[in-house]
Amino acid sequence: VDTVVAGNRERDHRTGFTTPPKLTLKSLMSFAAHPKWTLNYLLHEKFKLANVAHFTNKGSSIAKGVMEYINEQYDPAMSWKDAEYCIKRWQGPFALKGLMSVEDAKKAVDIGASAIMLSNHGGRQLDGSRSPFDQLPAIVDAVGGKIEIIVDGGIRRGTHVLKALALGATACSFGKGFLFALGAGGQP
């Protein structure tokens, strides 16, 4: 239930972000301004999203190729009944991600979820929604102790984790740090 449709990645559309990069006057100027990055890109194995690469066209825009494929995987008709069915079939711990209201948190408890992940995708996917930190105290008051509450989105450093735990979260997830590390190729 993370999100029922892919996010509108306005920055990717605006900047013309593609993989691999397309040669345009703007991209050539960027390559010239970043010679170390450009040389590294030309001399090493090309970046690819291995888990979806075989579903997209080579040279397609991330915003159009990969995101179209991912968007096709979402079901905008996902319902609480569907979530309950999945939980019963799975017969193990089951987390529902993307919940942001007290009502949804209570419903997750009612259908047997073992955890909820409060998430607005760091404001990137759901930029008009409140932050998980804004929602956390009310959700903890309503369902704390009945279900694991994981804060996802907006976690950038250890003090954010401490604040979330102090407000009653059970745990935090921290994806961007790992993505930044992968993006840097392990280099400082």
Q: What feature does the model see in each segment?
A:
Residues 1-5, 111-132, 161-187:
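Glycine-rich phosphate-binding active-site loops on the catalytic face of alpha/beta enzymes
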Residues 26-31, 126-132, 141-153:
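Short, basic, helix/turn surface patches
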Residues 95-97, 117, 150, 173:
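Structural detector of well-ordered beta-strand residues that form the stable sheet scaffold
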Residues 22-26, 119-122, 141-144, 174-176:
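Glycine-rich loops and low-complexity Gly/Arg-rich segments
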Residues 100-112, 139-151, 155-170:
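Catalytic cores of alpha/beta
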Residues 61-63, 82-85, 117-118, 139-141, ...:
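A short alpha-helix capping/helix-coil boundary motif
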Residues 1-110, 122-125, 134:
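Active-site entrance/lid segments in N-terminal catalytic domains of soluble metabolic enzymes
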Residues 17-20, 115, 135-138, 168:
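Short, low-complexity, polar/charged sequence segments that are solvent-exposed and flexible
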